[in-house]
Amino acid sequence: MKAGIHPDYKKVVFMDTNTGFKFLSGSTKGSSETVEWEDGNTYPLLKVEISSDSHPFYTGRQKFATADGRVDRFNKKYGIK
């Protein structure tokens, strides 16, 4: 790797603004806000709107839309089961 062209990779805390869930991960993104983590160290705080704690796919609250096909519409129209 060339020196001086890559961004600094450091540990940051991501916080889900909907649920307040926090997790520690690595990122090149920085922030002026900081938070003290469970290990006693202070890390930059990055706020996110959606994480695995609030996304419907991961929480099991996902809704599936079923679209009726042509055969289903025909059967419904003519009362065929």
UniProtKB/Swiss-Prot annotation:
One of its GO terms (biological process) is translation. Transmembrane segments: none annotated. Keywords: Ribonucleoprotein, Ribosomal protein. One of its GO terms (cellular component) is ribonucleoprotein complex. GO terms for molecular function: structural constituent of ribosome. It holds the Pfam family Ribosomal_L31. The keyword Ribosomal protein applies. The keyword Ribosomal protein applies. PANTHER family: 50S RIBOSOMAL PROTEIN L31, CHLOROPLASTIC (PTHR33280), LARGE RIBOSOMAL SUBUNIT PROTEIN BL31C (PTHR33280:SF1). NCBIfam families: L31, PRK01678.1. Part of the 50S ribosomal subunit. Belongs to the bacterial ribosomal protein bL31 family. Type B subfamily. This is Large ribosomal subunit protein bL31B. It comes from Bacillus cereus (strain G9842).
